[in-house]
Structures are given as C-alpha cells and as structure tokens.
Amino acid sequence: MTALDSRNWGLTPAMETGLFQKPQDRIFIIELENSIVSFINSNTESFQLRPMNSYYRLLSHQIAEYHNLNHVLARTQDSCVILFKGENFQKIEGKPLLQELQLNKKPEECASSSESIEKSNNNRIFRILKRKEVGNECDYKIDGNTRTPNSNLTANSNKDQKIEIDDKSSTDLEQERIEKERLYEQRKQEIFDKLNKSEDDVKSTNSSGSSDSDNEWSDWLNGDDSNTQTSNGSVSSSSPFNSSVTTIQVNKPQQQFYDSRRGRGGRRRGTNNYKDAYRGQSRRNKENGGYQSGYSSPYLVYPPPQMGGNSLPTYPLMYNPAGPAPGPAPSPMVMGNNTVFMNPYMYNMNPQGSCSFGTPIPMYPPYQYQYQYQYNTQYHSGPYSNTPSYNSNNYTRSSANKYHHFQGKNSYSGAIPKRSDDSNSNKNEGIRRASVEGSPSSRDTDSVEMKFDKLNI
C-alpha cells in the first residue's frame, strides 16, 4: 500500500471521506474501481453502471475522472452512469489505485479533527438579526438643475444597510415566546367560546319554539274531547284549531297490512296454509304505520257552488260505476235538466244556497265517516261496553262495516262473539243476558249517553 499524500493525486473531499472515514463507502469504491480496471483492460468502448443513489453517482463520476474516463448519465434512466473511453483515451502509467492509497495522518487524528469540527459547530451561538426600518423621507439639496443628497442621508442609508445584532439574551427570548403563546391560546379560546355561544343560542331558540308547540299539542291530546265551559258561561274548545265544531277521531280504524312477500303459487313454503293477510301485523307498527291501500276511506268530493239561473250550468263530478266504491252506490241527483250520480259530499253545502263573487267562501267542518266505528276505547271493555246503542251485535255486524272489527273478549262473560246462526242463537242470548245483568243501571246508562252527545261523535 502506497503511503502518499492524497492531494498529489487530485482526490476530492468526498473521495477522501469515503476511502478513509466510512468503511461502507470504501467497499463501494473498491468494487467500482475493480470493475473500471477490467473495463480499461477490455476492448469495449462503453460500460454502464448499475442504478445507484445520488451520492454514489457523485463518487462514480469522480472515480471515472480519476482514471481518465468520460462519464455521462443514461438517457433512459437518470440513476445510471455510463463510462466510455473516447478517442483520446490513454491509460496513465504509474498512477496508483485508490484502494492502495493511504493518508499521512492517522485515522485517529482524522476522527479527532472531525469531532472537533462538529463540536465547534454545535457550540456556535446563533443570534437573531434585526433589520432597522428605512425611512421614506429624504432630504435633498437642490442647486439649479442638480440634486445632491445630504451628508446626513448618506450616513443614515449606510447605517440602515448594516445588520445590527440583537443584544437580547436567551431568557428574554424565552419570555417573549411564552408571552406570544399565551396570547395565541387566549385568542383561540375566545373564538371557540364565541362559536359555542352562537350554537347554544340557536339550540335554545329551536327548543323554545318546539316546546311551545309540543305543549299545545300535548294539552289538546291529553285533555277532554268535549268543550269546556268557562266562568263567563261561554263554551271554549280545547282543540288548537280555530273552529266552532271539531270532530275528533280518538280511536281510528285499524289499518290493514298485507303480506308483501312474493307468492309461490299462493302458498307458503313448508306449510299447507294459504297466505294470511294479517299474519305480519305483529312485526309492524299498527298505530303509526304508513298509508295502506287496504284502508277503506270514503271519496273526498268538494261540492260545486250553486250558480244563478242566468249563468252557465254546473257540471259536477260524475259517478264512475267501473271504479272502486267503498260503500253503496250513490243516489241520483237532479242538476239542471239532467239526472246525474254524485258521490257523497265530504263537506256541508252552503246554507245560503248561492255564492257571489268577491265574497270569501266559508269553510265548514266535515261530516263523519260513512262507516261508523267505536271511537272511544274507554267504553269498549269497561262497565259500559254493552250499551245497546253503541256496542250491539247489529252495530258491529252491520253490512256497512266492510272490514269487521271484532270487539274482542267480553270483560264480564269471558266469551268471544261468534257468527250468529241457528245452532248458537241460544248460547249468544244467554251470554247477552248475563252481560246485561252485570251492567250498571239505566240511570248510569243515560248519563253515559249524555256524555256521548256532548262529545259530538
């Protein structure tokens, strides 16, 4: 191994560091140099190196320059270096290989020198430089057509261009940093408090508005259905609507839910029973379900206004016999000189018989449904469940009631009403007598009927 000074052979600092201070880089340099020597001794004109990082590409360029070779980057891959000999290539005789060189300094001295440089860099104190603001006002002396700057201006500009070193100590800088952080946190907290306050105000306004409406509805639903008499003797309605008479349906007719699953020949798999339209009711909300087509509601028809004799005749809605009719066929009516069929009116007619232009058309409360139902559940299974006018067999088994809503189990006799025929007529008569014996007196029944009349049902 040749012990020579590396500066005599044109070694770069990167080559010196890789050869004498970093063993991993020294291994790379030795392998690369062996490949270059084999390329020089061969007849090939170019040699492409393997892909490598930028630091090793730098060492490759410098090592190729050391051995008098030309070097370029590949066009297809920027991470590859291509070495070629060229026309004027000559092998330098007597030049040692890089792996044979050795520095005059010992490695310990090199390591100590590098450590001292690092320590000096770490101990260096950096100060914050502050540039003084330059004034915009300038003083000039104008003599004729020439302008000469004042000597004070020149001195000030020279002083402004110089960078002054801040004399603040590290403690002052730390205190300033702490103060800035405190102001930042304070400002951030104020912003968040303002946002939270605005959100709380919005929620409070929404809750107050909804609570008022909820209280109004709850008072109306939980209160008595009948009109209450005030201290002045006037009758006030508990309904939130501004109406003189309001019909309230407490117990609406039970909606019919049908099985929406696909039919397999009209039968269920694994059973011999046909589809049951009421079997799926236990899995659904019966009270607040959506609108179903099975619910039989009457047609809603607005009555045409009565016109004068000199005006054009009115053409009301005609009855379509092909359409679905929830009840019996409507009765004929004479409109003009023609006899037409009208659906039952949902609203009362104007008692005055005619209306004039410019006068608002009054609104009238609707009729009750054409099918009578038991609207009050408190009289279904209570002591007044067998009142003849509200819970008789003729009432529940009427032909007008398309969907028969059975009363369920009797609270007194424990019997379920069945279809009346010749074989069971005696049994039903006995059950009816037993229930009448357990019912209250006629006096109580009359008071109950009076309450029903007040409820306007």
Curated annotation (Swiss-Prot):
Q: Which domain of life is it from?
A: Eukaryota
Which positions does the record annotate as the modified residue Phosphoserine? 198, 435, 439, 447
Would the keyword Protease turn up in this protein's UniProt record? no
- Assigned keywords, A-Z: Cytoplasm, Phosphoprotein, RNA-binding
Q: Which Pfam families match?
A: R3H
Q: Which residues form the R3H domain?
A: 26-88
Give the span(s) annotated as Disordered.
Answer: 142-181, 195-291, 406-457
Q: Where is the composition biased (Basic and acidic residues)?
A: 159-181, 418-435, 443-457
What PROSITE patterns does this protein's entry cite?
R3H (PS51061)
Q: Which InterPro entries match?
A: R3H_dom, R3H_dom_sf, R3H_domain_containing
Q: Which GO terms describe its cellular component?
A: cytoplasm; nucleus
Question: For bias kind Polar residues, which ranges apply?
Answer: 145-158, 248-258
A GO MF label: mRNA 5'-UTR binding
Query: Where is this protein found?
Result: Cytoplasm
Q: Which SMART domains match?
A: R3H
Compositional bias, Low complexity, is annotated for: 226-247
Which GO terms fall under biological process for this protein? Answer: galactose metabolic process; RNA polymerase III assembly
Q: What else is known?
A: Present with 892 molecules/cell in log phase SD medium.
What is the name attached to this protein's record? RNA-binding suppressor of PAS kinase protein 1
